[in-house]
Amino acid sequence: MTAVFPGELLLAEGIHEIARVTALLSGPLRRAPRVAQVVGPGFAGRPWAPRLTDALRPLDPTVVVHDGPTTPDSVAALARQLRAIRADVAVAIGGGTVMDAAKAAAALADGGPPDADRVRQACAAGPAAGDTPPAVRVVAVPTTAGTGAEATPFATLWDLKHRRKLSLTGPRVRPSAAVLAPELLAGLGRRALATGILDALCQGAEASWSIRSTPESIRWGTSAVTLAAEALDQVQDDAPDAAARLALQRAAHHSGRAIALAQTSSCHAISYPLTLRLGLAHGHACGVTLGRLLRYNHAVPAGDCADPRGTGHVRRVLDALAAPLGGTPARAALRVERFITACGLTPYDALDVDHRSLAAEAVTYPRCHDNPRRLDRESLGRLLGERSEMEETCG
């Protein structure tokens, strides 16, 4: 299946579509395209790697390995590699780290010689109006179940030197095409699938409840949550079938569509210091506060509402998000918190973190203030310091 969505993102499903989509993107060329196959260090060990390698063989790609977190240094190095082989298309096969690295590198590869400082400057500059398409087009092929990076016009980078999360943003960063292949989730364990589904849930929820949300972002976001909810039990039981794996990939993609319109908000703002301090996987770091924020936002009083559309709008959105997860925001929150524990992930209450210090850092990220109920250092510190409903139920 192949479809083109607004914004000219070409979407296809199935490993067999990757080479065809790549060829479509390079159609105007009067020569064979130069293709970079960007992968992570574990690519060769994945059970589907031989099949994917065979599918790309007609394109004679140059394999480029991106190792470690996506940082200004790693993006600069990858951009130099893309320049060295004069790539026309980069096929990014991996999770959010690999896809974001390829997106950022492709966006910066046709400027001057890239280095880490230039990458930081590009992140600080923000999106530029009227950007021309990058010389290197990106085909994003997700091999995890959560990031939605194949649909977004931004890439997450980690400045480990300054302990900050960075974002490279703009139309040049969005992939030209995405290929969803649920068979690429084969071999992922329960924890990996769980962190992915938590990321998709948070992205869908945050892009829906954000004060920047639009009717379209709410539609994509609630669809992402609905699709993810359908697969929760199978992931928890460590037995997702083919239909569940496809639902996971579609949920992630829909969540990416949602945040491309409205971005993320509070769960993600809290997740960044959790990842930097404790090394939590991204989806895990986001998901541990989703239950708290579902309850907190649904209980918004008029005097605390940050959304100009009012408390009625906020509650309607929260009710729509909660429906597929348990019927009410309280039940949805409890289901998410129980899912985290059942999948062997550490819940927020068991993390070794100072609530007030975490809150103080989280509110420095502007997206924290896109939450529909106002959050400041004091209110967020109190919220994080409360015992979860699950702990109270089990205690």
From Swiss-Prot:
Q: Name one GO molecular function term.
A: metal ion binding
Going by the UniProt record, its keywords in alphabetical order are: Antibiotic biosynthesis, Iron, Metal-binding, NAD, Oxidoreductase
Q: Which domain of life is it from?
A: Bacteria
Biological process terms from the Gene Ontology for this record are: antibiotic biosynthetic process
Q: Is Cell membrane a UniProt keyword of this protein? A: no
Q: In which pathway does it act?
A: Secondary metabolite biosynthesis; bialaphos biosynthesis
Record EC number = 1.1.1.309
* Reactions performed catalytically: 2-hydroxyethylphosphonate + NAD(+) = phosphonoacetaldehyde + NADH + H(+)
Class of this enzyme: oxidoreductase
> Which residues does Fe cation bind?
199, 268, 282
Required co-factor?
Fe cation
Describe the outcome of a gene knockout. Cells retain the ability to produce phosphinothricin tripeptide when grown in liquid culture but, the amount of PTT produced is lower.
Keyword Metal-binding included in the entry's annotation: yes
Per its database record, what is this protein's job? Catalyzes the reduction of phosphonoacetaldehyde to 2-hydroxyethylphosphonate, a step in the biosynthesis of phosphinothricin tripeptide. Phosphinothricin tripeptide (PTT), also known as bialaphos (BA), is a natural-product antibiotic and potent herbicide. Can use both NAD and NADP but the preferred substrate is NAD.
The record's PANTHER family line, in alphabetical order, gives: ALCOHOL DEHYDROGENASE, DEHYDROGENASE, PUTATIVE-RELATED
Q: Which family does it belong to?
A: Belongs to the iron-containing alcohol dehydrogenase family.
Q: What is this protein called?
A: Phosphonoacetaldehyde reductase
Q: Which organism is it from?
A: Streptomyces viridochromogenes (strain DSM 40736 / JCM 4977 / BCRC 1201 / Tue 494)
What gene is it encoded by? phpC
